[in-house]
Amino acid sequence: MPAVVQVHDLSTVFGKGAQAFSVHEHLNLTVARGELLSLVGGSGTGKTVLLRHILGLTQPTSGNITVLGRPASELGGDGASSRVGMLFQHGALFTAFNVLDNIAFALHELHTVPRALAHEIAMVKLCMVGLKPEHARRMPADLSGGMVKRVALARALVMDPPLLLLDEPTAGLDPNGSDAFCDLLRELHAMLGLTVVMVTHDLDTLYALSTKVAVLADKRVIVHAPPAEVARFDHPFIDHFFRGQRGLRALAPAPAAAPPAKEP
């Protein structure tokens, strides 16, 4: 299966001289078409930094990244949103724009279609993420956290990109909201044939969505495999993250519903 993302011999260093510190050293990663990959790792391992490199927002110190066969460094220009969609952790909606104009932003900026058609496309995406037409004129301040995530997801998908990047997509959602958002992502992944790279700390989200998991530790990807295989890999971080109490809770079967009480 052809690679959508190819990261080769990547190194990332912040600071200079005595203050310099490295986040990535000789990191390699291949993301195949159709994969739904979760990036996990401890604090400071550079998960979001790697996501920003893939998006082309920042440049590594050395090494190279290709996205859909082109250097990631080219993604910062016009038309990038037609190749990669990005859902930021807190949504990052434009507070001065209503929901519809937030979703249609890339279409307006690139002038690829008339404004009326841009709004029609945005309305289709609005409904695709489970929102209603009456939400189109709301302002971001009037939305719940779950609705903000859905609007941001619609905006990320407005140009029909084949690659979707997600930074902590269920952060800040209650359990029901998190489950509903995972269901939506799973449906869109299948329906649109997306390749997805997701940073998450949430094991429930990871197990609900991931076809593969890549673990960042020791400044590189130490394992890239299906979740069950990763959970068996011998490493202190994996032992704590996957086989600690949180990991065991995520894997535990849901308790059976109590039978209805009998009438006396």
Please tell me what each predicted stretch does.
Residues 116-134:
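Conserved ABC ATPase "signature" region
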Residues 55:
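Helix-to-loop junction immediately C-terminal to a conserved catalytic motif
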Residues 139-143, 147:
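Conserved ABC ATPase signature
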Residues 164-167:
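Catalytic Walker B motif of ABC-type/P-loop ATPase nucleotide-binding domains
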Residues 160:
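Conserved catalytic motifs of ABC-family nucleotide-binding domains
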Residues 71-85, 109, 116, 230-233:
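ABC ATPase NBD coupling module
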